[in-house]
Amino acid sequence: MLGWLVIPWNQIFTAACGCFLSDRNYIHMMESNLDALQKTMEELKNGRDDLLGRVSIEEDKGLQRLAQVNGWLSRVQIVESEFKDLLEAMSIETGRLCLLGYCSEDCISSYNYGEKVSKMLEEVKELLSKKDFRMVAQEIIHKVEKKLIQTTVGLDKLVEMAWSSLMNDEIGTLGLYGMGGVGKTTLLESLNNKFVELESEFDVVIWVVVSKDFQFEGIQDQILGRLRSDKEWERETESKKASLIYNNLERKKFVLLLDDLWSEVDMTKIGVPPPTRENGSKIVFTTRSTEVCKHMKADKQIKVACLSPDEAWELFRLTVGDIILRSHQDIPALARIVAAKCHGLPLALNVIGKAMSCKETIQEWSHAINVLNSAGHEFPGMEERILPILKFSYDSLKNGEIKLCFLYCSLFPEDSEIPKEKWIEYWICEGFINPNRYEDGGTNHGYDIIGLLVRAHLLIECELTDNVKMHDVIREMALWINSDFGKQQETICVKSGAHVRMIPNDINWEIVRTMSFTCTQIKKISCRSKCPNLSTLLILDNRLLVKISNRFFRFMPKLVVLDLSANLDLIKLPEEISNLGSLQYLNISLTGIKSLPVGLKKLRKLIYLNLEFTGVHGSLVGIAATLPNLQVLKFFYSCVYVDDILMKELQDLEHLKILTANVKDVTILERIQGDDRLASSIRSLCLEDMSTPRVILSTIALGGLQQLAILMCNISEIRIDWESKERRELSPTEILPSTGSPGFKQLSTVYINQLEGQRDLSWLLYAQNLKKLEVCWSPQIEEIINKEKGMNITKLHRDIVVPFGNLEDLALRQMADLTEICWNYRTLPNLRKSYINDCPKLPEDIFVPLLPEKSPSRFFFF
């Protein structure tokens, strides 16, 4: 009964005094603190929501939120939970207050409650003061980037040997050496992938391609690119980069994999700390020279030898295929002789095996043996066996034109991915293949040659693109042949990817026939040149190039191909370009050039002119009279627009087969589609700043359309005209549902930006081969494909069954009212990449069932 008396008197006294005398005044300030707390909590929640919005946008790009952001959000979550508890007790505690809030019926409880409110208020204020993060996310740096490795034979034992050596505490640096094409890179890739199993053992595994013409900064950039997600280091000096690398790696247990060393690399100059037993780090490199192993002070060297006869035969058999080997009883014996000529070199076995994979007669196999025996070129070192073997694949090409096309592919840097169409345009203008195009402007002959080169293993087809590239060893062989096996090296100057800062002084201008300066650090070209024999000049993708002097083009009477594309800061073409009377190919796309020199009109032999993605403006007045031989004219995404004057010029270009253009006037668009020859030449079309009730696009007239862009337009209706003139002339009783494909057969890319007047884009169903679609800043669009319209189209055209059946890449940005993509978007069978941003009415998990293991990637099509 007297249990209440157990409360210590001093506690009661302290609480009572706290009601009136405490500096903190927890009881008296309780109500005002509660009001302030509720307001600041609202601010905190708003701040949290804003931050989560920023984080969501960055995570949609594939970035990872910062730990400090996560920590702040976690603290907010805890405070929010505690605040809810306080609110639940608020009515009880405030109800106990008396004497105008200066006292309480239960001073101890009110004092404790008031103290919690006060402290929480301070904590919320502190959180609010820290809510403004400059950065909220960063790129995810994986410890190991797994490599895709082709099928191998005889490599497993070597992988285990190298791995065992690496796991030895006494070995910090491991050298893998062997001749070119023997599989050193594949071995290094296999080691790289084994580190996936030991992610917890090492902090980071870094892959660096060194190559023959390496620069220290190039190696540093690759290392820093793996270590840091920011790009602030890009403009630093070489010594500063070395310091950044050292300070980062010094704290880590790292693995550095260096592929293709041709000479010693000073790791100290790069900034890489030496691997020691104490730090547990490792360096592994591949090289063709044992001397490099010694200079690099490798703790152990492992030779990557050619395959044994049995292993070589197994690889060759797999490459040729059993169908060919069984096509004649004598072929297996002859095939073993051919395989033996490869001396167990995997690259040669693959290349020659691929070349022989379509030879079904013993005569062809016997001829192959004779050619291999007669190719007795002697070269020091690796070239003694590799180049003659590789040259066999070159010699086996059908004719001279295919060989010329192949050799041309060596003018770009190692592993450069080049569009097939670009190669073909080069070859046509160089005169390697027939310049007469088909009526649709295409040249199947060029694609056929590329197919032959790919099947011969001389070119590599790139995944998911229409590009091809050349293996670096094959490229070396091609350059060797191009220089007449090294006898006429002055006739060709290729500095692609060499990071040179100026045009070399040792060029023999009188003799040189081909020059290529690609991806260099050249800023100005000011030399005076006299090049009576120069026919090909490639100066492209030089990001620092700002000027080419007038005198550079003064005397190049035989120049046929001039490619200046992707020099972003090049703003002017020299007037002396008018001296290039033999020029047939001119590409200035992706440059800062805004006007064309008057002298361009003198280039009457020009058949290819590319002005895409430039600031070039005007109507190209007089182009038909001054450049009458043009077959290809491209000004897509430039400031040139087809108007009445240019329309007449284009119609007068009687040889024109390929056109990319921009149109602002709907009547001009109608006139283009009304001209069968002109319309069929359109490959890329940009409709810009067009305001009209209706736009009609004819799938018949625009049958060759590959890219369509619609920018800043107000169009109430986009109608697809899929009927031919013959079909329109039929009576209604004669018209049946379409059984053939009625749509744009070649349209693969559509980009829509700031389109008004459209609630849906159901007309896109007529682009059944669409691979890339980007729609942005078009707030009135509610659906990409409307179900009712879509069903009507599919009923009319029976071959349109699955909407977007070939779509691979999809980007939707800033679409406030977009609620749906299409009624059965989950059947998109080929979607591999999606990017959705600021589409609040679109379900957040819209593609989760489609891409369970893929993160959205940011990409742009143009």
Curated annotation (Swiss-Prot):
Coiled coil feature spans: 24-61
Binding site for ATP: 178-185
Swiss-Prot/TrEMBL keywords: ATP-binding, Coiled coil, Leucine-rich repeat, Nucleotide-binding, Plant defense, Repeat
SUPFAM superfamilies on file: L domain-like (SSF52058), P-loop containing nucleoside triphosphate hydrolases (SSF52540)
One Gene Ontology biological process: defense response
Alphabetical list of InterPro entries matching this protein: Apaf_helical, LRR_dom_sf, LRR_R13L4/SHOC2-like, NB-ARC, P-loop_NTPase, Plant_NBS-LRR, WH-like_DNA-bd_sf
LRR repeat placement: 511-532, 533-555, 558-580, 582-604
Entry keyword Cell membrane: no
Residue ranges of domain NB-ARC in the record: 135-438
Gene3D superfamilies membership: Helical domain of apoptotic protease-activating factors, P-loop containing nucleotide triphosphate hydrolases, Ribonuclease Inhibitor, Winged helix-like DNA-binding domain superfamily/Winged helix DNA-binding domain
Pfam families xrefs: LRR_14, NB-ARC, WH_DRP
GO molecular function: ADP binding; ATP binding
Protein function: Probable disease resistance protein.
Family in the record: Belongs to the disease resistance NB-LRR family.
Free-text domain note: The LRR repeats probably act as specificity determinant of pathogen recognition.
Protein name per the record: Probable disease resistance protein At5g43740
